[in-house]
Design a protein with these regions (language model features):
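Conserved N-terminal phosphate-binding loop of PLP-dependent enzymes in the Aspartate aminotransferase
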Residues: 2-446
């Protein structure tokens, strides 16, 4: 069970002293608009001053239950003392010395730890990055490089989100705004249908049947009519689609997809940027499906909030020649120290089991209360409530999120109409249920 390490009473949260956004928050928002490029959307004007585990405090003194973990980053909570101490110790030694030009032990230790937990058999190697999108760019480059340019095609999925830099953006297909005005994309990327449990692109009766149709589409239409599988280097998927709406594919689809890649000699990579490091009750979400990937892309929760990512893969595949791929900051020593401490916290405090158990309880609560109207899905503490009007996405997601925020729950959305629930894994059960009841009360108003 997670421990409480922070100097506030968890029973006193949420606490709204000033109706949000308060005057100090509004002033920061005003200044932000004057100096920061507004190429992204904020869900509501939450201006964070401090974090306490699964709680954030705004600049006006309001306390919120953090139901998004900084977009699934703060798995061990905000300012976990073990992580903070590790950062301090490393910062007193040295802050930077480029790993791709020199050596330091803390990065080696982290690579060894990642190799130990990665669900890939045999020898593995790691490449460190600075973010999720950079990890995806690296996976794309590694896969094409492995085949020496002889397999130029890559298959991704409709509904996927892999990032906003050019390679990852070309693989992304969750919202048109991510790609509009930026063509041409990186060439030779093909998007295949993904088996959505509610919005199946085929006339399927069950998620499993939808999965079978999606596999058949790959074989019968893409491989027989569009591109020969011998020209495909990589199939990339999210074990749970994140920005696409917290969509969990059926097990038969993932297993069939892995079998297909084996048969055609195609590399199989999973984007675990949002799902990794305990979020779904496993170290990696792909473990739920009983398959092994060739490559895993990670970032977000790996270093408890510091910018770090990692690609973990079979040693044979992680074989680009010297000089072919490098960066300046990947594997930064302070971020690596934070990551090692974060992985220790996940293990020592039993956060994998806590995420799985609490996630099942929350899903049951949501299904019992609103499952007759909305679709509740997810793995562990990665839960989506897709708001529906009949079978169509509802149009009041933003109103639900804003009302929850004003009542002290910092929850965000995904997809077209999905409430995205991804609290820090250290959240106590009572606090998680308190936030859930607030969200349910807001939903009852619709």
């Amino acid at each position: 069970m997670p421990k409480w390490h922070w100097p506030i009473d968890p029973d006193a949260v949420p606490r709204i002293l000033v109706e949000p956004p308060g005057p100090r928050a509004l002033e920061v928002v005003r200044r932000d608009g004057e100096v920061i490029m507004q190429s992204f959307s904020r869900w509501y004007p939450l201006v964070v001053a401090r974090g306490y585990g699964p709680v954030v405090e705004d600049v006006d003194g309001n306390l919120y239950i953090d139901y998004n973990a900084g977009i699934a980053v703060a798995n061990v909570g905000h300012a976990h003392p073990k992580v903070v101490e590790a950062i301090k110790r490393q910062a007193e030694l040295f802050l930077h010395y480029s790993l791709t030009d020199f050596y330091y032990e803390v990065a080696v230790k982290l690579a060894e730890r990642l190799i130990a937990i990665a669900p890939i058999s045999g020898r593995k190697k790691v490449f460190f990055t600075n973010s999720g999108t950079e990890s995806i760019e690296g996976v794309l480059k590694i896969a094409r490089g492995y085949f020496k340019g002889q397999r130029p095609y890559v298959i991704a999925f409709l509904g996927a989100f892999h990032g906003r830099t050019y390679g990852s953006m070309s693989l992304t297909a969750s919202k048109p705004v991510h790609r509009r005005h930026f063509s041409p994309m990186v060439p030779n990327v093909i998007h295949a249908p993904f088996p959505h449990p509610v919005h199946c692109p085929f006339k399927a009766e069950t998620p499993e049947e939808c999965g079978e149709y999606a596999l058949a589409f790959l074989e019968d239409w893409i491989f027989r009519r569009l591109v020969d599988p011998s020209e495909v280097a990589l199939v990339l998927m999210e074990p749970v689609q994140g920005e696409g709406g917290y969509v969990v594919p059926p097990r038969n689809f993932v297993q069939g997809l892995r079998k297909m890649t084996y048969e055609h000699g195609i590399l199989f990579a999973v984007d675990e940027v949002q799902t990794g490091f305990g979020r779904t009750g496993r170290w990696f979400a792909v473990e739920h499906f009983g398959v092994e990937p060739d490559l895993i892309a990670t970032a977000k929760a790996i270093a408890a909030g510091l910018p770090l990512g990692a690609i973990i893969g079979r040693a044979e595949v992680m074989s680009l020649p010297r000089g072919a791929h490098a960066n300046t900051f990947g594997g930064n020593p302070v971020a690596a120290a934070a990551a090692l401490a974060s992985l220790e916290v996940i293990e020592e405090e039993g956060l994998l089991n806590h995420a799985e158990t609490l996630g099942e309880e929350l899903k049951k609560l949501f299904r019992d209360e609103v499952g007759h109207r909305h679709d509740v899905r997810g793995l562990g503490l990665m839960i989506g409530i897709e708001l529906l009007e009949g079978k169509k996405p509802a149009k009041y997601l933003e109103d639900v999120l804003l009302k929850a925020f004003k009542r002290g729950v910092a929850v965000i959305g995904a997809g077209l109409s999905t409430v995205r629930i991804a609290p820090p894994l250290v959240i106590p059960r009572d606090m998680a249920f308190k936030a859930a009841e607030i969200i349910l009360d807001v939903l009852r108003g619709h």
